[in-house]
Every structure is written in structure tokens, then in C-alpha cells.
Curated annotation (Swiss-Prot):
Cofactor: binding comment: Binds 1 divalent metal cation per subunit.
SUPFAM superfamilies for this protein: IpsF-like
EC code(s) of this entry: 4.6.1.12
Source organism of this protein record: Cytophaga hutchinsonii (strain ATCC 33406 / DSM 1761 / CIP 103989 / NBRC 15051 / NCIMB 9469 / D465)
Name by which UniProt lists this protein: 2-C-methyl-D-erythritol 2,4-cyclodiphosphate synthase
Sites annotated Transition state stabilizer: 36, 135
Chemical reaction(s) catalysed: 4-CDP-2-C-methyl-D-erythritol 2-phosphate = 2-C-methyl-D-erythritol 2,4-cyclic diphosphate + CMP
Entry's family note: Belongs to the IspF family.
Residues that bind 4-CDP-2-C-methyl-D-erythritol 2-phosphate: 10-12, 36-37, 58-60, 63-67, 134-137, 144
Binding-site residues, a divalent metal cation: 10, 12, 44
Domain of life: Bacteria
Pathway the protein takes part in: Isoprenoid biosynthesis; isopentenyl diphosphate biosynthesis via DXP pathway; isopentenyl diphosphate from 1-deoxy-D-xylulose 5-phosphate: step 4/6
Family annotation (InterPro entries): MECDP_synthase (IPR003526), MECDP_synthase_CS (IPR020555), MECDP_synthase_sf (IPR036571)
Protein's job: Involved in the biosynthesis of isopentenyl diphosphate (IPP) and dimethylallyl diphosphate (DMAPP), two major building blocks of isoprenoid compounds. Catalyzes the conversion of 4-diphosphocytidyl-2-C-methyl-D-erythritol 2-phosphate (CDP-ME2P) to 2-C-methyl-D-erythritol 2,4-cyclodiphosphate (ME-CPP) with a corresponding release of cytidine 5-monophosphate (CMP).
Amino acid sequence: MKIKVGFGYDVHQLKEGRPMWLGGIQLEYTKGPDGHSDADVLIHAICDAILGAANMRDIGFHFANTDDRWKGVDSKVLLKEVCRMIREKGWEISNVDASLALEMPKINPHIERMQTALSEAMSIPVEDISIKATTNEKLGYVGREEGVNAYAVALLIKP
């Protein structure tokens, strides 16, 4: 059996009037991440962690922000495709552990819905997906509510 770990990171600027997509669900808030797709930083970090563990480059390589096919796309579509790609190479996802850094909105009330959305997109059990959130204690661009960061680790196994 082969076991590999991958790390992913993403950041997006927050803009007034943009929808707030995080973890595959839309949250009510006055700002949202700005980007080429729906700018779901959590899913993008998870995609990079999975791709990294499989040594398959990164999300920008496979879904370039210069390609209009991905403009405005639901990031769950990207995650499903990443999972298909790694499974085609014989990998399975053991678990994903992710953290969000943002001041608002509060994430804890939404974690179970995020886990469900991600579980469906990745075809893995909810209990294999951990999501945590923290603030930046009002420090830096995250603390000023100008941006949101996401970090993720994925463990892949190849029987």
C-alpha cells in the first residue's frame, strides 16, 4: 500500500456584493470571494491538497483562470473532476482536514452542511472530512475582512 499526503492553500479577496461560497455552500453575507470561478477558497485548497498528494500539479494547471470554460463555475464541479482524475491513477482519498481563516461570517454553524456538500462531491464519508475555522484576531487583510484564506491537507492511499 502506498500512502501520500498533500497540502493546499488558497486566498481570495473579499468584495462587496459577491456571493459567499465556502465549502460548497452559499452563506449569507455582504461580501464574498472574488475570482474566476465561484471563488470557493475551501474547495480550491482541498483540490490542491488532493492534486499535490497525487503529484498532479495544482488547480491552476488543470482549470486555468484564462479558460472561459471555468468562468463562474461551481467549484464542486472542479472537485469532482479532481477526484475522478486521481481515482483514474489508482488513488483513493483517506481523509481531508481543512481550516478557514476569516473574521466573518461565523463558520461553525455551517460546518455540517459544508461536510455534507464536500462528502457528496468527493464521494467519501462525512466523518473523513474535518473543517475548522479561525479568525485572524483583526490582524492583516483577513482581520480587516479584505480576504479569506483556506488551508487543507489530504491523505491519499493506493492499495
